Amino acid sequence: MSTSIELFPRPLQDEVVDYSSESTVGVEAGRTEQSWNEDFAREQIHNLVRQLFLPGWPKPLRQVVFSPVDSGTDVLSICIRVGDALAEQAAGSCCVAETCPVQQEQILAEGCSAHSIQKQFGTLRDSAEQLSSNLWFMSGEVFQQGHHGPMSALWLRARLAELRLEFDYTVFQGPVVSGDTAAAMLGGLCDGLVLVLAANSTRRLAAQKAKETLSCANSRLLGVVLSERTFPIPASIYQRL
């Protein structure tokens, strides 16, 4: 089985968002399935970055939110991979930022050190964890540094302005859209929001409600990312390996 991440800038049409039966892929001779999967996933991420950040017209996107429709959907790993690809392709500083704290174990699993979740003082960039020459990871604790309670539009607007001064691009791991208004508010204050759907579990009704929530908040929906998508490689291909 293989997993892909794709951007669909169009309305969803299926009761269950599952494109697994629509795609088949081949494996080049002499390559393992794991090697092909890794290259394919990397290509998907790079295409996603080019669609969102690099066209530069009518104006370049600098702050983009990735928010799930359902709780439990893995968004952090997508954001980190998008940030890594963006740092490779873009000429500027990039940051992957959580908007709310998560468990330390989850951060460490994505390749960030414990140093990044310790509260520090100074500029936001100084408090973030530098992952490469132009890529930083900002934990939820650092993002909300000096703030307590629910995010207000006034505080959030000021924090986003700080980030624009310190980073050329910021990829946000946003809250669940169906949870409250925080995701829609964040998307409205940023350049837009990408909905993250789990291919085999997100239902059409939940996705439609999420889109309505964003529309009511005047939050720009940039597209839909389909994650956790699996599809079979034909048996005839396996027989040639």
Across the structure, where does each feature detected by a protein language model lie?
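C-terminal lobe/tail of nucleotide-utilizing enzymes
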Residues: M1-F53, Q208-L241
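P-loop/Walker-type NTP enzyme "switch/lid" segment
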Residues: S21-H46, R50, W57-R62, S67-T73, ...
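A generic secondary-structure signal
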Residues: Q51-P55, D84-A85, E162, T213
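A conserved segment at the C-terminal end of the G1
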Residues: L76-A97
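Short, aromatic/basic amphipathic alpha-helical patches
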Residues: C79, I107-S116, K209-E212, S236-L241
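Short, well-ordered coil/turn elements that cap or connect secondary structure elements
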Residues: Q89, S132, C216-S219
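Conserved catalytic-core segment of NTP-binding enzymes
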Residues: G149-L241
